[in-house]
Amino acid sequence: MIGKLKGILEHVFDDHIIVDVQGVGYVVFISNRLRPSLPALGESLSLFIETHVREEAIRLFGFVAKAEQEWFCLLQNVPGVGAKVALAILGTLSPDELAQAIALNDIAMISRAPGVGKKVSERIVSELKSKALPFNDNALHFTPQPHLEVTHQPTNDALSALVKLGFERDQAARALALAMNALEGETVSSALLIRHSLKLLSPST
């Protein structure tokens, strides 16, 4: 099994690249998010590799971050999600954004990925709610998402309330995701979510 490749970027195609490692060219499939960060042809790069062995072929999938590779594997535990769908999701959402979407039951956010419909998105949230990898909670500020649609009603109400209190929508959503994780297993109301979120959003913390 190949776990990591370090070599020279030789060719770039629509869905894969060729990495030259000491004269051997490896075909590595990548997500759309990785393409803009690729080095120039002829320059070196290092990728975490997930190897899929099938009767007809051996396929290598490359990721810059270990978290992306872990999510790639985790997503494929969901019925109906194969390598192609998992890669499409990771090509649309970062690991942090995906973890946030699952924590917030945000079906619409996951459905933004090409070829991922509502039913698959609902299955991902349902199956991975208790297994999802944690996202980076060191900072509540993150890249804004223009179409954040929360489908869990108490969370939706809490989000609206926090926005009315003057917090940025994306900042409030991140705090709510942390609150949802902390309150897992409890009966969650919008008031309870608001209280927990305000503690996270308070300047004193």
UniProtKB/Swiss-Prot annotation:
One of its GO terms (molecular function) is ATP binding. Residues 1-64 are annotated as: Domain I. Homotetramer. Forms an RuvA(8)-RuvB(12)-Holliday junction (HJ) complex. HJ DNA is sandwiched between 2 RuvA tetramers; dsDNA enters through RuvA and exits via RuvB. An RuvB hexamer assembles on each DNA strand where it exits the tetramer. Each RuvB hexamer is contacted by two RuvA subunits (via domain III) on 2 adjacent RuvB subunits; this complex drives branch migration. In the full resolvosome a probable DNA-RuvA(4)-RuvB(12)-RuvC(2) complex forms which resolves the HJ. Residues 144-149 are annotated as: Flexible linker. This is Holliday junction branch migration complex subunit RuvA. It comes from Bartonella quintana (strain Toulouse). CDD domains: UBA_RuvA_C. The lineage of its organism: Bacteria, Pseudomonadati, Pseudomonadota, Alphaproteobacteria, Hyphomicrobiales. GO terms for biological process: DNA recombination; DNA repair. Belongs to the RuvA family. Its main location: cytoplasm. Residues 65-143 are annotated as: Domain II. NCBIfam families: ruvA (TIGR00084). One of its GO terms (cellular component) is Holliday junction helicase complex. Keywords: Cytoplasm, DNA damage, DNA recombination, DNA repair, DNA-binding.
